Curated annotation (Swiss-Prot):
NCBIfam families: phycocy_beta (TIGR01339). Transmembrane segments: none annotated. This is C-phycocyanin beta chain. Contains two covalently linked phycocyanobilin chromophores. Its main location: plastid.
Length: 172
């Protein structure tokens, strides 16, 4: 896992070059907006239980067959496993947001997840719907102006949304 800074250094080192001015500018921007990033991660983390439970509740309301007898989330144990998995995805998205790079999400959470779900008979499309619901809630947290560093958070909100999109695509 590399953060955005480590990745730039590794790339420049592999090429045997100094860090380019464009790379330096991108890292400088990332550093200058660090407080927004910290505020976003703190907000998502503080709201994590609500984000996860609301996404699951909404998914089960839209797809009641999942919690009906014979459904993939039938029994409390399976619902708990669903909530746990959604929480893990959300947690790794906060790590990626903090690092400014998706590699931790990809390497430690998403790689092999589709195959695992297929082997267990978990409907990936339903998981993707729940992840999209979490995305909507998390992006709302990022865009909430209360208690965050003043400034435009649209680029950061787009970045956070892209991590959710990446996770949703990984399970279908």
């Amino acid at each position: 896992m590399l953060d955005a800074f480590g990745k730039v250094v590794a790339q420049a080192d592999a090429r045997g070059e100094f860090i380019s001015s464009a790379q330096f500018d991108a890292l400088s921007k990332l550093a200058s907006e660090g407080n927004k990033r910290l505020d976003a991660v703190q907000g998502i983390t503080a709201s994590a239980a609500t984000i996860v439970s609301s996404a699951a509740r909404s998914l089960f309301a839209e797809q009641p067959q999942l919690i009906a007898p014979g459904g993939n989330a039938y029994t409390n144990r399976r619902v708990a496993a669903c909530l746990r998995d959604l929480e893990i995805v959300l947690r790794y998205i906060t790590y990626a947001t903090l690092a400014g790079d998706s590699s931790v999400l990809d390497d430690r959470c998403l790689n092999g997840l589709r195959e695992t779900y297929q082997a267990l008979g978990v409907p990936g499309s339903s998981v993707a719907v729940a992840i999209q619901k979490m995305k909507d809630a998390a992006v709302s947290v990022v865009n909430d102006p209360s208690g965050v560093t003043v400034g435009d958070c649209s680029a950061l909100a787009s970045e956070v949304a892209s991590y959710f999109d990446r996770a949703a695509a990984a399970v279908v």
